[in-house]
Amino acid sequence: MAEEIKLTPLETFAQAISASAKTIATYCRDSGHPQLSDDNSSGLTGDVLPPSAPQAVTAARQTILEASYRLQQLVTEPSQYLPRLTVYPQHLAALRWLCHFRIPELIPVQGTRTYYELATEAKVPLHQLQSIARMAITGSFLREPEPNIVAHSRTSAHFVENPSLRDWTLFLAEDTAPMAMKLVEATEKWGDTRSKTETAFNLALGTDLAFFKYLSSNPQFTQKFSGYMKNVTASEGTSIKHLVNGFDWASLGNAIVVDVGGSTGHASIALAESFPDLKFIVQDLPMVTSTSKDNREKTPLPETVASRISFESHDFFKPQPVQNADVYLLRMILHDWSFKEAGEILANLVPSVKQGARILIMDTVLPRHGTVPVTEEALLRVRDMTMMETFNSHEREIDEWKDLIQGVHTGLRVQQVIQPAGSSMAIIEVVRG
């Protein structure tokens, strides 16, 4: 009897990609959804896969992302590691330049422009535009269907349809990336500090203020950060749908939800649209609530939710002013702070939390290394690094979350931990017994 030949990792990853590609192609063929194409024949608008795609199809997409990433790692020579790494900062530099000069906005979504036309209208040097755009094209941002003719790719068209992506780009290039590059200097200068004013952020932006105090004092920074928050909230891993669908909100009935540190209210708006019995109070710092007010004046809230959402200024390091609400929501808040300061935020809620009320924490629960796909873990490690660079904090594993919560008040306990499928964050339900 012939000995069974075991597949090598190279063959395993290749087979996984092939099988998953067939799953997606078959689904697109049977459902009428456009086939994925690198020549843009599938169109510029819409998702790669529709939200209604079966779980097996979305899982196939994730398999391709993971297996292709692992396959590239497998076949990349050690000598190619640094040359390949140089691509990423240049992609970011190109994207910043294009967004700063608003080049994507000058190209019709379904049309073309010449480099000369774009350079003339944007008042930028032609040779710079050509070099920078062609760098971006290697990263699937823009296309050059004919020599010296520029058109949108699916990705760059999305920037036109969603202008706040420009703010996110500028926040990433002008603030987040410089912070990452100052981590060495921060360690050399301050060592194992936990201070919020002794961070890579402070060195990169040249400020003595902690992040959120700087945020409240700098409107331009606030605008960029708001664009980042809006889009991070809408991305798959941090999509609001995981908050909306991941918890049994309907069971609360006519409840009041306090959205602590809720920025411009995107989470509360999404919940209000799905659960008409709920009322919301969105709290954040004065500068953020002012920006939120300006945004609502430009784009009013839908009439169906406007009467059920109110906004107020509040510093969550001070006692919670709203007494006896049913839910206090902390979404993407506590990971910004050290163990001590996160405990202070929770402690400021406790006097206002009635018996049987809930504190819902939606945040990253860091997995043990190697227990999730590399592509997923890499993004979680990005968040962990960003917390270090910005706040001298870090993402927590579940045992750390439990220690934090139980250390605040003996009456608080973790009722359940919900991990919505596809979410990079978990919902930790905390009750006061």
Swiss-Prot record:
Q: State what the entry records as the consequence of deleting this gene.
A: Impairs the O-methylation of C7 of the heptaketide monomer.
Q: Which amino acid positions bind S-adenosyl-L-methionine, per UniProt?
A: 284
Task: List the catalytic activities from the record.
Answer: 7,9,10-trihydroxy-3-(2-oxopropyl)-1H-benzo[g]isochromen-1-one + S-adenosyl-L-methionine = 9,10-dihydroxy-7-methoxy-3-(2-oxopropyl)-1H-benzo[g]isochromen-1-one + S-adenosyl-L-homocysteine + H(+)
Query: Pfam families, alphabetically?
Result: Methyltransf_2 (PF00891)
- Biological process GO terms, please? (M)-viriditoxin biosynthetic process; methylation
Q: What is the E.C. number? A: 2.1.1.-
Kindly state which keywords UniProt assigns to this record, in alphabetical order: Methyltransferase, S-adenosyl-L-methionine, Transferase
- Catalytic residues of the enzyme: 335
Specify the pathway. Secondary metabolite biosynthesis
GO function terms (MF aspect): O-methyltransferase activity; polyketide synthase activity
Q: Which PANTHER family match?
A: DUAL O-METHYLTRANSFERASE_FAD-DEPENDENT MONOOXYGENASE ELCB, PUTATIVE (AFU_ORTHOLOGUE AFUA_4G14580)-RELATED
Described purpose of this protein according to its UniProt entry: O-methyltransferase; part of the gene cluster that mediates the biosynthesis of viriditoxin, one of the 'classical' secondary metabolites produced by fungi and that has antibacterial activity. The first step is performed by the polyketide synthase VdtA which condenses one acetyl-CoA and 6 malonyl-CoA units to form the heptaketide monomer backbone of viriditoxin. The product of VdtA is then O-methylated on C7 by the O-methyltransferase VdtC. The O-methyl group is important for the stereoselective coupling of the monomers at the final step of viriditoxin biosynthesis.
Question: Can you tell me which family this protein belongs to?
Answer: Belongs to the class I-like SAM-binding methyltransferase superfamily. Cation-independent O-methyltransferase family. COMT subfamily.
- Please give the name of this protein: O-methyltransferase VdtC
